[in-house]
């Protein structure tokens, strides 16, 4: 393994000839092409963890991606971010000991609730903003924020939300800009699709998209044709469709507009968004919008297909949904000058740690069951042009 800031990898990897002397492996949570995840109890403490077991033979030629992921995860200590607790190395395996989260995925919780309001959505987004603001202060850009990467810590009704999946994360360099076109198209910022250098502002755009979905249950951008989809995003063309947005506050819409601002220089930062009245004040409404939102989530995010199209890291319902190690061959997005997805394999090398740390990988809309946006009279609200 390479060095991080001059630090030898041997200094942060613990040697373990037999990992089972340290952990009792309870059950397999998931398997993939390159790794296995097990529910494990640390013998010395009795604590439960999700241990990701990666054969070294699967890492050959992919060391740099592993190092990038670990470099990111090792820096992060935040209550709303899934933590890397430890790293062990045996002669044949690398073991990543991750914080165990068992509360399930965001969409599942919303659908299962009988009551859901703007205030609930505001509370969720506030936690995301706090976590992403922390990342940005650390010089880390997530680059792939989406609902599927938001997990509940526990089954408790008041459980906090957790951000997972740092397979596309990047440490900002001195120039504070990046240029690799990657992420999930439905959530990616216009400047990324335009192949322009970009910064942490891309995460703020994604938070705006997430907020949009949390309030209506469907994505702001949709088209059967990928080029047209990308054109919508490039122009920041989205609407607050009636009747789905009729009962949503103007404050919520203003919050979204400021995050889904085409110009990254005008776009809200996490700090600015956290001060918006919809987050920091009392403008988020308490009206129950569960019926409409949950119906749209069921319609637009069908599990059987949707989950195949995203990187996700989750221990859900009996801690059995986590699957790791799916190949990225079908998921690495590269946006060409004509906004085609024809070269999906070219964006990120298959060595990207999503291959090892996340579940079925892919790109929104590619291989997923696409469903049309509601065909109704629109309110006339659009994003900045």
UniProtKB/Swiss-Prot annotation:
The modification Phosphothreonine is found at residue 180. InterPro entries: Kinase-like_dom_sf, Prot_kinase_dom, Protein_kinase_ATP_BS, Ser/Thr_kinase_AS. Induction: Down-regulated upon cholesterol-rich diet. Expressed ubiquitously with high levels in brain and low levels in kidney. Isoform 2 is highly expressed in brain compared to other tissues. In hematopoietic cell lines predominant expression was detected in T and EC cells. ATP binds at residues 29-37, 52. The modification Phosphoserine is found at residue 122. There is a cross-link at residue 113 (Glycyl lysine isopeptide (Lys-Gly) (interchain with G-Cter in SUMO2)). Its EC number is 2.7.11.17. Residues 23-279 form the Protein kinase domain. It catalyses: L-seryl-[protein] + ATP = O-phospho-L-seryl-[protein] + ADP + H(+); L-threonyl-[protein] + ATP = O-phospho-L-threonyl-[protein] + ADP + H(+). The autoinhibitory domain overlaps with the calmodulin binding region and interacts in the inactive folded state with the catalytic domain as a pseudosubstrate. This is Calcium/calmodulin-dependent protein kinase type 1D. It comes from Mus musculus.
């Amino acid at each position: 393994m390479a060095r991080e800031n001059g630090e030898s990898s041997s200094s942060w990897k613990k040697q373990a000839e037999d990992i089972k002397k340290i952990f009792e492996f309870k059950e397999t949570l998931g398997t993939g092409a390159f790794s296995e995840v097990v529910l494990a109890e640390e013998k010395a403490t009795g604590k439960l963890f999700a241990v990701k077991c990666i054969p070294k033979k699967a890492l050959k030629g992919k060391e740099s991606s592993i190092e990038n992921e670990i470099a990111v995860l090792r820096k992060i200590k935040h209550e709303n971010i899934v933590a890397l607790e430890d790293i062990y190395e045996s002669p044949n395996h690398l073991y990543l000991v991750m914080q165990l989260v068992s509360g399930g995925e965001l969409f599942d919780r919303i659908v299962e609730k009988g009551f859901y309001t703007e205030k609930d959505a505001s509370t969720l987004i506030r936690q995301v903003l706090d976590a992403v603001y922390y990342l940005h202060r650390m010089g880390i850009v997530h680059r792939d924020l989406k609902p599927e990467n938001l997990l509940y810590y526990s089954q408790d009704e008041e459980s906090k939300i957790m951000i997972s999946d740092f397979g596309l994360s990047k440490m900002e360099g001195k120039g504070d800009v990046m240029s690799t076109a990657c992420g999930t198209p439905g959530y990616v910022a216009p400047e990324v699709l335009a192949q322009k250098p970009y910064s942490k502002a891309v995460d703020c755009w994604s938070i705006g998209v997430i907020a949009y979905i949390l309030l209506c249950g469907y994505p702001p951008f949709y088209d059967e044709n990928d080029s047209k989809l990308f054109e919508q995003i490039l122009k920041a063309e989205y609407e607050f469709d009636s009747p789905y947005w009729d009962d949503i506050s103007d404050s919520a819409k203003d919050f979204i507009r400021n995050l889904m601002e085409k110009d990254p220089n005008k776009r809200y930062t996490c700090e600015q968004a956290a001060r918006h009245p919809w987050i920091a004040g009392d403008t988020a409404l308490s009206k129950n919008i569960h019926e409409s939102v949950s119906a749209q989530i069921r319609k637009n995010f069908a599990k059987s297909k949707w989950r195949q199209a995203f990187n996700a890291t989750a221990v859900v319902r009996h801690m059995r949904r986590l699957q790791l190690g799916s190949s990225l061959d079908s998921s690495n997005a590269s946006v060409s000058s004509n906004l085609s997805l024809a070269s999906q394999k070219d964006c990120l090398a298959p060595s990207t740690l999503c291959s090892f740390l996340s579940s079925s990988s892919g790109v929104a809309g590619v291989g997923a069951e696409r469903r049309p946006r509601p065909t109704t009279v629109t309110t006339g609200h659009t994003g900045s042009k």
